Amino acid sequence: MAATKHILRYLKETTGYGLLFPVSLNEFEDCLEAWSDSDWCGDKVGRKRTYEYFFKYLKAPISWCSKKQTVVALSSCEAEYIAAAETTCQCVWLEYVLDDLKLDHVKSMQLCVDNQSAINLAKNPISHGRSKHIETKL
């Protein structure tokens, strides 16, 4: 009950706040930006890693998430690759939402990943024979 009161007090005091969506002056600014990341062995008991993603549209934050991966990754490259795949799925869904809201936007996405091995794996998955097991996990 105390947590509910705390939330209601917070909402009452922040009714004047909101998200600012500036007008796009450039078609390159009018894209959906996404960041994804995965931790390094955060859960030592279950061995599942936590991944996060964050989205901006017109330079304003619109969505974020942090949750445990559903599978056990064998390496940091695999964990980052899975996080990027989950982020891409969310991005496709957000583009459908923007279409449903009749927002005029350029269909482009910028996905930022901080692991060079995962980026190389995403660019050329055919040359990586040791990554076939990832497809069956997703």
Pin down the residues of each PLM region.
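Divalent metal-binding acidic/histidine catalytic loops
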Residues: 1-138
